[in-house]
Amino acid sequence: QTDLKFRLSYGKTGNQDGIGNYAWQPLMSGGINYGNNSGMAVTSMGNNKLTWETADQYDFGFDLGFWNGKLNMIADIYLKNTNNLLYSMPLHGTSGFTSITSNIGSMRNYGVEFSINGHLNIGKVNWTSSFNISHNKNKLTKLLGDDLLPIGSNRALKVGEELGAFYLFQMDGLYQYDGEVPQPLYDLGVRAGDVKYHDADNNGIINDNDRVLTGSSNPD
């Protein structure tokens, strides 16, 4: 006997994780001293445009069974679009704050999952085997300003890239002799045997402007 079952679903969910009760407005508190005077200061930066993160997810799959369930295959495909993505966005140090909870853009998750299992009974022997494989990806489809947004020391957000992609200096090998070291770097003490970093903007200086996106830690 062969059994075949199809599954199709759609769901819409909201997420408010990370949004405090008063995250939409700045907060002030007393007990702040400056010199010999006491006063009040802003202790929390508000965001009056903050809203829920929403996600629309589509799923399609099928279950296929052979020989009264002795061999079964299960496959699923999903697509999830998340809008108003909640993120703790870094702020410039001059603001007096390190970050602010914001709706920074949109993200798409998609993937395929497949599994197969078999059951075999021979006398007193009960044999069960299973195998599964999956492929899951995500990418940012929209970002505030559509500009690259560094986060932390070695990651960044960019439209078309995975969430939290690595943002690193690319190594091009080692300097073999002092003569090939660009003068600005030579003046800084770089010599033969030191790492040769890729000069992305070709100005002879290695700084944060030379970092590039180089994949992510998310497995396939």
Feature roles, as predicted:
Residues 1-6, 16-18, 64-74, 118-129, ...:
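Secondary-structure transition into beta-strands, especially the periplasmic turns and strand N-termini
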Residues 3-11, 103, 113:
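Acidic/histidine-rich catalytic neighborhood
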Residues 34-43, 89-99, 202-212, 216-217:
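Flexible, solvent-exposed coil segments and beta strand-coil junctions
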